[in-house]
Curated annotation (Swiss-Prot):
Compositional bias annotation for Low complexity: 47-56, 101-132, 650-662, 733-744, 794-815, 869-879, 1076-1103, 1231-1240
GO biological process, alphabetically ordered: germ-line stem cell population maintenance; negative regulation of macroautophagy; protein deubiquitination; proteolysis; regulation of apoptotic process; somatic stem cell population maintenance
UniProt biased composition (Basic and acidic residues): 1111-1120
Protein name: Ubiquitin carboxyl-terminal hydrolase 36
Source species: Drosophila grimshawi (Hawaiian fruit fly)
Gene name of this polypeptide: Usp36
Active site: 211 (nucleophile), 471 (proton acceptor)
């Protein structure tokens, strides 16, 4: 036998027989021939070194034979032993002395000793070529072949290697690997290919900044091809033998498979500990507990899984790169890009191939995913003279363009949202659940006729503004066709509209082709790789597996004919396009006719016929059962006869779409088509049953707001004002009050102007009601009162008219001023007599609630409240104020002609007179008010019980300054717009100072404080000629109430309840608190002020008439002097007064059970200045900050700094106090009283 090592079987007996044969004479002769060839190549004499070389070669063969015998032989079950074992073994061995007709073989078998030199020379000459060919095979090079038999053997032995490095067959074709580790046909695409039932999957617990890990795993587990492969690794899972090198829990593939099974079997969230514990194994620089990038983790995770799979093979380190790219992970995610660089000088085209597992798309100049693909695969120009052309042999300008040589089964897309500096591009990129990449594939026209369709199966989203902070979530497609959002342990369904509007970061698209059995390599993926043989053998390969491979650039005519024969029946006639026209996807290798019959099932065809027209009109997609499928009509400009199928289905009756039993299981696909394409077709108004996880309520309501708003009284804007819905009865009362007041004021000479305003308002109501129906239809029928809600948008116009009315009203004579005051008291007296037994308490509660909600509901509440009371406001304000409409209709305008309207009240405690100390003091005519004082009081003293809706009683002992408005400018604007309902029709409109100007509603006390601090400490009030301490008493009362446990919101509520007289408990408690505080404040409250406080509380509980008259008089006073600039200045000072009062009052109380920020400031000041040891520290709780100095030594030393630090803190506190309007004497008093209470 001339061959030393022939094709060997893998059994031990065959190896031993080959070893014995190699040690015989045949081995010696063959070895001698090889040795002579080597000596001839080296230029030496063959006879001199033949003996030693033969011994050396024989010793090497014996050593290698022993190694083969001692090696462990693994057995593996294969389908075809001849093709999978013997054919592969041929590529491992080199023929030392092949058969040839040149006489070398016969001479080699002949006289060994006699013709050594001659045979050696001839053999050496022929051996040079053979050695050259052999070395070319081993090293990857190519050389000229001399003999036809030599060519045949070389091609059989290593045709793959010669193809890999540019064989003469076709250098522009993708090279073939020597060995395929995992066949592409074994990948099962789609959930339907698995035998098991796939659940939605549970969430994953976040164990500390692991949202990137959880979202990445969820996205991978919802890729059907990857999930099916992980489940199929059960045999490896049981017999994993690489746990020693990959950790105690097994390899990373086993950890992934176990984690996937746990998410499918458990009902609650799982902890991905098997993956989290191998984080350093996946990537060395990743740290447990630190935030990482999801895409980076994905890349390292897939690479670790590939390495774990390669470790199953003994010689995995010796495998070349092409073989390593045939792992299951590369078969799923891997693809090849074709790069064509064209020289602009000689038009030479250089073609290279690049392996990829994901596409990184630049979105800076794109708004849609299709635009990003166009930019990625577009032709770009390289920099001038920067490319060295192989044809020109010089640097020239060139263009470069990518195309898909082999499309992956699962396409991973990463949008470049992060820069090198960590900044994030947060622009919205719109995408569709199905994409077609046929126009980017480098394929023949025959293969290009079939669309390269992908379906969105999962995605990873990032919430945040930077790469270094944020949160990752995942979205996955389940077997039912619904999408679910996976936010760590939270799993919830998500509509297709929300999916497409998500700022995606990583997206996974899978080929939209499924099969019943083992999925073969799809024809639509544009690949040219065949797993059996090269391009020369494409014809036999297609014969054995016709649906597995279609060579797009087949070199033989038979291959092209076979490919056309397989694919042509799919596009002829109106039959369903098998493999992609329905849910079955890939075709099996059994022939075209058999495949076509196999996929013609009646239920699927019926479902497609009833949806074909709608889906084709939307985006040309053809639905399968709960799966995305793509029609061939929109594949590319290369039209095929598949359009006949779509056109024929387009003319199907539309009534088939309304069959609920067929539409229900695939409603999610209909929504995906309709929502993604944004078409206004039949699907938008389809009344077919929808899946509960994917509603279309938002889109439908947004398109038909004008229709649904008239039928639904409850709208989203109405919910922003929760107390407005219970005001129908109040609106009716206000309308009645408006009519009554107009009749009572009919004799007034100035009513003509108010009537004109009312008519103008009605006209505006009609116009603005029509405007409202067009612009804001959700408020047309808010409470069923179209008239009261018609003035939603006329705030600016109302301000303008009110300003003009006020300015015209201010040009009256002094006689008209006196008549205006008389008219005020008469109208209020008649109003109280008429509405004494009406529903007063409901309005008070509603007004209190509205005052509390003014800041957060400003925009909607202002518009709605103003709408409710605009009509009544214009007329009632004119009748009440005899033409002064400043507080009613808008902002108060300043005018020197404004009448003073003083309030002189005779009560049980004496005659009270309130004067002014502001810029308008010179213009107030107090004498006129004094002249009318007794008459007015006699008229209004009769009703003894009373206030109709006066919950802002001026004498209510409420907290006037404790609650600081969070947004004073918003409150002011709301006040000027006249948006409060009861404010404009109730007798609170006295002398101009509205109780609603402050949150607590204590109008008189707040006004007294404001006037008192105009001079920063000068008293301007007189109580029977005596200086009043009301401002200081109010500070104590307010602070006492807060310290007693009432919160800010509760204090407002209690104050309103006490003022209105509806809660006897609150009134009693507050009165007792008032009395206690009056008695405890030695320096700030006198006996007279204490009795006055008690009498005011009692008067409030009994609703005395003088209190009401005083409130009315002060409301009228406010209308006279409130202009915009003055009001703004007053509010700024008022806010300072509030801060000072709270600070002063907080130190003069006992240990508070609640929290007070100003008390915290005072306590912190005492903590910092405690080194002097003057007094013991005070804490809110016995164990609260007991070791503050020991635990915060740095802060203590930094801010306290011994005596100097305490002095500095005291000085700063004093400066803040004085700047806020407080007095020095008052501060010392409260600080000393606070120290006494703390020491006690």
């Amino acid at each position: 036998m001339p061959v030393s090592l022939a094709v060997c079987e893998t059994t031990a007996n065959v190896v031993n027989a080959a070893l014995r044969e190699s040690l015989g004479s045949c081995v010696a002769r063959a070895a001698l021939s090889a040795d002579e060839a080597k000596t001839s190549n080296g230029g030496g004499d063959g006879s001199s070194t033949s003996g030693s070389s033969t011994d050396n070669l024989q010793s090497q063969i014996v050593a290698n034979a022993k190694r083969v015998l001692l090696a462990k032989i693994d057995y593996e079950e294969v389908d075809n032993y001849h093709e999978s074992v013997l054919a592969k073994l041929k590529s491992k061995y080199i023929v030392i002395k092949p058969d040839s007709n040149g006489g070398a073989a016969s001479n080699g078998n002949g006289n060994y000793n006699g013709s050594n030199k001659t045979n050696g020379k001839f053999g050496a000459g022929n051996g040079h070529d053979n050695n050259g060919n052999g070395n070319g095979i081993v090293n990857g090079g190519t050389s000229a072949l001399n003999g036809g038999n030599n060519r045949k053997q070389i091609v059989v032995v290593d045709h793959q290697s010669s193809n890999q490095h540019g064989s003469p067959s076709n250098p522009n074709e993708l090279p073939k690997p020597k060995r395929v580790l995992y066949q592409r046909e074994h990948i099962r695409i789609g959930w339907k290919q698995s035998e098991r039932k796939w659940q939605v999957g549970t969430g994953m617990l976040n164990v500390g900044n692991t949202c990137y890990l959880n979202s990445s795993l969820q996205a991978l587990f919802h890729i059907p091809s990857l999930a099916n492969w992980l489940v199929s690794e059960s045999a490896h899972l049981e017999n994993c033998n690489i746990s020693e090198s990959c950790g105690s829990n097994g390899c990373i593939i086993c950890a992934m498979a176990k984690t996937l099974q746990s998410t499918q079997s458990n009902q609650s969230a799982v902890r991905p500990f098997l993956i989290y514990s191998k984080l350093r194994q996946i990537c060395k620089h990743m740290v447990v507990g630190r935030q990482e990038d999801a895409h980076e983790f994905l890349r390292f995770l897939i690479e670790a899984m590939e390495k774990a799979y390669l470790m199953r093979f003994r010689n995995y380190k010796e495998l070349d790169q092409l073989v390593k790219e045939t792992t299951p992970l590369n078969q799923i995610f891997g693809g090849y890009l074709r790069s064509e660089v064209r020289c602009l000088s000689c038009n030479h085209v250089s073609i290279t191939f690049q392996h990829f597992q994901d596409l990184l798309l630049d979105i800076r100049k794109s708004d849609t995913l299709e635009d990003a693909f166009d930019g990625y695969f577009s032709r770009e120009r390289l920099e001038d003279m920067g490319y060295k052309c192989e044809g020109c042999k010089k640097k020239v300008s060139a263009t470069k363009q990518f195309s898909l040589e082999r499309a992956p089964i699962t396409l991973c897309i990463q949008l470049k949202r992060f820069s090198m500096m960590g900044n994030k591009l947060t622009k919205q990129i719109s995408f569709k659940p199905r994409i077609d990449l046929s126009r980017f594939a480098a394929r023949s026209p025959t293969a290009a006729a079939q669309p390269l369709s992908y379906r969105l199966v999962s995605m990873v989203t990032h919430l945040g503004v930077s790469q270094h902070c944020g949160h990752y979530t995942a979205i996955g497609l389940t077997e039912t066709g619904s999408y679910y959002n996976f936010d760590d342990s939270c799993v919830r369904p998500i509509a297709m509209q929300s999916v497409c509007n998500t700022n995606a970061y990583i997206m996974f698209y899978e080929l939209d082709v499924n099969g019943n059995g083992h999925v073969v390599a799809p024809k639509m993926n544009g690949m040219r790789l065949t797993t059996n043989g090269g391009q020369q053998h494409s014809s036999p390969v297609v014969a054995t597996a016709p649906a597995a491979v279609v060579s797009a650039t087949a070199t033989s005519t038979s291959a092209s004919v076979s490919a056309a024969a397989v694919t042509s029946p799919r596009f002829i006639g109106p039959q369903l396009p098998n493999g992609y026209g329905n849910s079955n996807g890939h075709a099996l290798g059994g022939g075209a006719a058999k495949t076509a019959i196999q996929f013609k099932t009646t239920p699927q065809k019926h479902q497609q016929q009833q949806q074909a027209q709608t889906q084709y009109q939307l985006n040309g997609h053809i639905n399968g059962a709960a799966k995305f499928q793509t029609g061939a009509a929109n594949a590319n400009a290369n039209k095929s006869s598949c359009n006949t199928l779509n056109n024929s289905k387009q003319h199907q009756p539309q009534q088939q779409q309304q069959q609920p039993q067929h539409i229900l299981p695939i409603s999610s696909d209909e929504e995906e088509d309709s929502d993604d394409d944004n078409d206004n077709d039949n699907v938008k108004t389809n009344k077919a049953p929808q899946l509960p996880s994917m509603p279309k309520m938002f889109e439908e309501s947004s398109e038909s707001v004008a229709l649904t708003a008239k039928l639904k009284p409850k709208t989203a804007l109405k919910s922003l004002v929760p107390y407005e819905s219970a005001s129908e009865e109040e609106e009716q009362q206000q309308q009645q009050q408006q009519q009554t007041l107009q009749q009572q004021a009919a004799t007034n000479s100035r009513k003509r102007r108010s009537g004109a305003d009312s008519s103008d308002t009605d006209d505006d109501d009609d116009e603005e009601q029509q405007q409202q129906q067009q612009q804001q239809p959700s408020l047309i029928l808010r409470n069923g009162h179209a008239k009261t809600n018609g003035n939603l948008l006329n705030s600016s116009s109302s301000k303008t008219k009110s300003a003009s009315n006020a300015s015209s009203a201010n040009v009256n004579s002094s006689k008209q001023k006196t008549d205006a005051i008389d008219e005020i008291f008469k109208s209020l007296n008649n109003y109280k007599n008429k509405h004494r037994n009406d529903h007063n308490h409901v309005d008070d509660d509603d007004d209190d609630d509205e005052d509390e909600d003014e800041d957060e509901d400003e925009a909607q509440a202002q518009a709605e409240k103003k709408t409710v009371t605009k009509s009544s406001s214009s007329s009632s304000s004119t009748s009440l104020t005899n033409g002064w409409q400043q507080s009613q209709n808008g902002k108060a305008t300043a005018s020197p002609k404004t009448p003073p309207s003083p309030a002189v009240i005779k009560t049980k405690t004496g005659i009270w007179q309130v004067t002014r100390n502001d810029e308008d003091d010179d213009e107030n005519v107090d004498g006129v008010a004094d002249a009318d004082d007794d008459d007015d009081n006699d008229e209004v003293a009769e009703p003894a019980v009373v206030t109709a809706k006066n919950h802002k009683n001026p004498f209510a002992a409420g907290k006037a300054t404790a609650t600081t408005d969070a947004n004073p400018s918003a409150k002011r604007q709301k006040l000027l717009n006249g948006s409060s309902k009861s404010q404009q029709t109730t007798p609170r409109i006295g002398n101009g100072y509205q109780g609603e100007s402050l949150p607590n509603g204590n109008a008189v006390v707040s006004e007294l404080l404001k006037q008192n601090h105009r001079g920063y400490g000068s008293s301007v009030l007189s109580w029977n000629g005596k200086a009043s301490e009301l401002d200081k008493e109010t500070f104590d009362l307010v602070c006492a109430k807060r310290i007693a446990g009432y919160g800010a919101a509760a204090a407002d509520e209690h104050c309103c309840d006490v003022n209105s007289g509806h809660s006897s408990n609150y009134g009693t408690n507050y009165k007792s608190l008032n009395n206690d505080m009056s008695s405890s404040s030695s320096s700030s409250s006198s006996t007279n002020s204490s009795s006055n406080s008690s009498s005011r509380s009692n008067g409030n509980s009994s609703n005395c008439p003088p209190c009401d008259l005083l409130a009315e008089a002060r409301e009228q006073r406010k209308r006279d002097d409130d202009d915009e600039e003055e009001n703004e200045m007053d509010r700024g000072r008022q806010r300072k007064i509030k801060s000072a009062s709270v600070k002063c009052g907080s130190g003069a109380t006992a240990a508070p059970p609640g929290y007070n920020p100003f008390q915290e400031y005072e306590s912190q000041k005492r903590w910092h200045s405690n080194k002097s040891g003057s007094y013991s520290r005070f804490y809110h709780h016995p164990n609260y900050r007991s070791n503050f100095q020991q635990r915060n030594k740095f802060k203590h030393n930094r801010f306290a700094g011994g005596g100097g630090g305490a002095k500095f803190q005291q000085q700063r506190a004093l400066q803040r106090h004085l700047a806020s309007g407080g007095g020095f004497t008052r501060r010392q008093h409260h600080q000393s009283s606070g120290q006494q209470q703390q020491q006690s």
